[in-house]
C-alpha cells in the first residue's frame, strides 16, 4: 500500500488520498484511490446521517438523481460493472455528477464496504454550499477532474497523444 497526502491549496486543508491495490481489479492491474477531505467533512459534521451497513447499495448505475452525498464515516466504493473507480472515505463526496449534469441518471454504483454514514445533500443545498464556500466548489471541481482523468486512463489508453503515428516525441 502506498500512501500519499496532498495539500489542497485552495481550501488550506489537507486532503487524504491513498492508493491501494484492489482485489476486484487485480486482473486489470488497476490501483484504487481512497479520497476524503476534512474541510468537506466539517461542512456536515452536525448533520444527521444515513447509516449504511457493509454491502448496502446507496445507489445504482442508471438510478434517478436524488442528490449527492458526503461521507461522514466508513468507506464507500464507486464502481461501474467490474471496474472499481475509487473508494470515498470521511470527507469524500459521491453522486456529485448527477447534480452538476442537471439530474442525469447515475453513472456508477456506490455501496458501503463496511458500516458507513453519509449525509445527503440536495440540489439547492449543493448550490448554496458552492456559492458560500469557494473552497468546497474547488474541491468538487478537483474531484470531477480527477475522476475524469482516471476514466481517460482506464478506458482510452489508445487515445493518448504519444500513440498517434506521425507525431514527434
Predicted regions and their residues:
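Cytosolic regulatory regions built on CNB/CRP/Popeye-like sensor folds
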Residues: 1-169
Amino acid at each position: 500500500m502506498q500512501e500519499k497526502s496532498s495539500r489542497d491549496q485552495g481550501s488550506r486543508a489537507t486532503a487524504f488520498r491513498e492508493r491501494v491495490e484492489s482485489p476486484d481489479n487485480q486482473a486489470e492491474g488497476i490501483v484504487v484511490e481512497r479520497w476524503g477531505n476534512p474541510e468537506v467533512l466539517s461542512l456536515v459534521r452536525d448533520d444527521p446521517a444515513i447509516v449504511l451497513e457493509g454491502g448496502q447499495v446507496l445507489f445504482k448505475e442508471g438510478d434517478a438523481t436524488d442528490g449527492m452525498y458526503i461521507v461522514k464515516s466508513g468507506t464507500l466504493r464507486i464502481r461501474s460493472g467490474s471496474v472499481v473507480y475509487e473508494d470515498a472515505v470521511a470527507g469524500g463526496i459521491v453522486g456529485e455528477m448527477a447534480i452538476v449534469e442537471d439530474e442525469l441518471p447515475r453513472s456508477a454504483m456506490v455501496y458501503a464496504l463496511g458500516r458507513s454514514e453519509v449525509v445527503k445533500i440536495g440540489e439547492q443545498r449543493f448550490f448554496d454550499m458552492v456559492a458560500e464556500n469557494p473552497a468546497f466548489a474547488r474541491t468538487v471541481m478537483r474531484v470531477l477532474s480527477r475522476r475524469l482523468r482516471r476514466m481517460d486512463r482506464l478506458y482510452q489508453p489508445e487515445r493518448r497523444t504519444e500513440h498517434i503515428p506521425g507525431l514527434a516525441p
